[in-house]
Design a protein with these regions (language model features):
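Conserved small/polar residues in nucleotide/adenosyl-binding loops
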Residues: 204-211
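Conserved SAM-binding strand-loop segment of SAM-dependent methyltransferases
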Residues: 160-171
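N-terminal auxiliary segments of SAM/dcSAM-dependent transferases
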Residues: 2-70
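A short acidic, Gly/Pro-enriched loop at the edge of an enzyme's catalytic core
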Residues: 173-183
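A short, conserved alpha-helix within the catalytic core of class I
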Residues: 192-202
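Conserved class I S-adenosyl-L-methionine
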Residues: 113-120
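Conserved SAM-binding loop of SAM-dependent methyltransferases across substrates and taxa
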Residues: 125-134
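Class I SAM-dependent transferase core
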Residues: 48-52, 62-108
């Protein structure tokens, strides 16, 4: 029934007043359902029974293994594969990349000399930024993409950065043998499913974790 209604609406065959009424009622029913404690528990239990992430191979094929040259054409100079920060004085994408990473540093209280894990590092914008800014830090960059890790290795070699350590890992079989002072993960958690197992793994590796 709903699919037939959508079919009619997409073809402009449903009066706007009726469409608005349906959307309002449907939204209210979903909100009521979402507030149910049983529903919340069911969702959490379902997430906790699954893997940390699903379809990681498909995700790679869809966009993570797209050649770096493509992203160089559409992203900023640091290939920041996540949100940037435009304030009133920021006029370019390159500046917005830096502004956002400065905010990460402030909020995570990152300092020189720390050991840092960048989980889901993308094309290495933050990892490389940290390695350049803090020469006494050791930055471990983890991605599921061979192309991304290869790109980071190439940039690190060009800039003679010895304190950055990129490696390919699937988050479902994450192997972390070091302790980290900071674990940063930028816009990766929306791709995760079993948050509990992931956070348990990360808390084990960090002696003083921060939110």
């Amino acid at each position: 029934m709903i699919s037939f209604g959508i079919y009619l609406a997409e073809r402009g065959l449903v009066p706007e007043s009726l469409l608005r009424l349906f959307i309002k009622q449907f939204s209210l029913s979903r909100l009521t359902e979402a507030k149910s404690e049983d529903k919340k528990k069911s969702v959490i239990d379902g997430l906790n029974r699954g893997p940390i992430a699903e379809n990681t191979i498909d995700a790679n094929e869809q966009h993570y293994e797209v050649p770096a040259d493509y992203f160089k054409a559409v992203l900023g100079p640091r290939l920041k594969y996540s949100c940037c920060l435009f304030d009133e004085e920021t006029t370019t994408l390159g500046e917005a990349e830096i502004e956002m990473m400065e905010l990460y540093l402030e909020r995570a209280q990152i300092e020189d000399g720390q050991t840092i894990l960048d989980l889901g590092c993308g094309w290495g914008s933050l990892s490389l930024f940290l390695a350049e800014r803090f020469p006494n830090c050791n930055v471990y960059s983890v991605s599921n993409s061979k192309d991304q890790i290869e790109h980071i290795e190439n940039i690190a070699k060009e800039k003679n950065l010895k304190n950055i350590h990129p490696e390919v890992q699937d988050v479902n079989s994450l192997s972390l043998e070091k302790e980290f002072d900071r674990v940063v993960s930028i816009e990766m958690f929306e791709h995760m499913r079993n948050y509990k197992d992931l956070l348990d793994c990360l808390l084990y590796t960090s002696p003083s974790p921060r939110d």
